[in-house]
Amino acid sequence: MTTYVWSYLLEYERERADILDAVQKVFASGSLILGQSVENFETEYARYHGIAHCVGVDNGTNAVKLALESVGVGRDDEVVTVSNTAAPTVLAIDEIGARPVFVDVRDEDYLMDTDLVEAAVTPRTKAIVPVHLYGQCVDMTALRELADRRGLKLVEDCAQAHGARRDGRLAGTMSDAAAFSFYPTKVLGAYGDGGAVVTNDDETARALRRLRYYGMEEVYYVTRTPGHNSRLDEVQAEILRRKLTRLDAYVAGRRAVAQRYVDGLADLQDSHGLELPVVTDGNEHVFYVYVVRHPRRDEIIKRLRDGYDISLNISYPWPVHTMTGFAHLGVASGSLPVTERLAGEIFSLPMYPSLPHDLQDRVIEAVREVITGL
């Protein structure tokens, strides 16, 4: 049987009764769109973060898009972000007519290099979008100081960082607005698509509610454009309510899996060139994915697949600026050297809180055999 980096089935077996009860509760309520479950989830997710507002939306991509629009980013504005991210981060910027401006990432933790951001700011820059990648947070203290000094908006992409902290503060609480994805693989994942934006600003929250509902503030009357059909549905909201009560347990489970990898693979770092994740000072990592690094990555992945039936992911094999869909940005190859080097060396080991010990041990043993045999 093939081993994959993620599976929801073991988690579902444990939570089946609660998940099915959530679905039945919604179906029996008589309300499928923007009903009590969405309202309750928004209240509870905001409370978890100690923040004033949460607005549920239909997916993480639109969460980033609506977050940007809600703080006033629009056509021809520039937004500083990274290319070492999932493409939807950049798609969200591009779709509203703004221009992504890329800075490189740090070699040690693969996060936005905040020392490079100010040099990327121009008179057209309106916002910065740091991506809390793989489960740990960018240095938001540095970005907040810069944003305030230069009059810029700060929008966190928290799709991979539910429950993560930096200097004691939760991801999503360190900006003007913060976008979350509840795609099924996430640390807090739905059984389908979902997203949310959190903010402490009343007017931003009002704009978000209008933006997700066609630009309407009352039924059938468009108050202001743009407007979208971007609502979190009741079924996913009710499932997320149930799973939110277990978020800290999910995080603890992921950290335990990460520690087991450290115990089983750490000695290969000095002897055989395998690099394990570095947890930056001040970060409380939630290990959305467990990204390792080796200069012979492609050979390792092939041997694991062909010889051990272990199928691994690469997050991400193509920097966004090198994709043909973003050729119009005109970003030259070689302009982001760390990002481009990482794309040829990083890969992900299986990571989910219900990962069985015997399966993880099989992966560890296989990785050891392959790498020591290179």
Curated annotation (Swiss-Prot):
EC number: 2.6.1.106
Modification type N6-(pyridoxal phosphate)lysine: residues: K186
Signal peptide from the UniProt entry: none
GO BP, sorted A to Z: macrolide biosynthetic process; polysaccharide biosynthetic process
Catalyzed reaction equations: dTDP-3-amino-3,4,6-trideoxy-alpha-D-glucose + 2-oxoglutarate = dTDP-3-dehydro-4,6-dideoxy-alpha-D-glucose + L-glutamate
Pfam families: DegT_DnrJ_EryC1
Alphabetically ordered keywords of this record: Antibiotic biosynthesis, Pyridoxal phosphate, Transferase
Pathway(s) per entry: Antibiotic biosynthesis
Cofactor field: pyridoxal 5'-phosphate
Binding, pyridoxal 5'-phosphate: G60, Q160, S181, F182, Y183, P184, T185, K186, Y214, Y221, N229, S230, R231, Y316
Gene Ontology molecular functions: pyridoxal phosphate binding; transaminase activity
Family classification: Belongs to the degT/dnrJ/eryC1 family.
Classification via PANTHER family: 3-OXO-GLUCOSE-6-PHOSPHATE:GLUTAMATE AMINOTRANSFERASE, TRANSAMINASE
Protein function: Involved in the biosynthesis of the amino sugar dTDP-L-megosamine which is found in the macrolide antibiotic and antiparasitic megalomicin A.
Protein name: dTDP-3-amino-3,4,6-trideoxy-alpha-D-glucose transaminase
Species assigned in the record: Micromonospora megalomicea subsp. nigra
Highest classification ranks of the organism: Bacteria, Bacillati, Actinomycetota, Actinomycetes, Micromonosporales
Gene that produces this protein: megDII
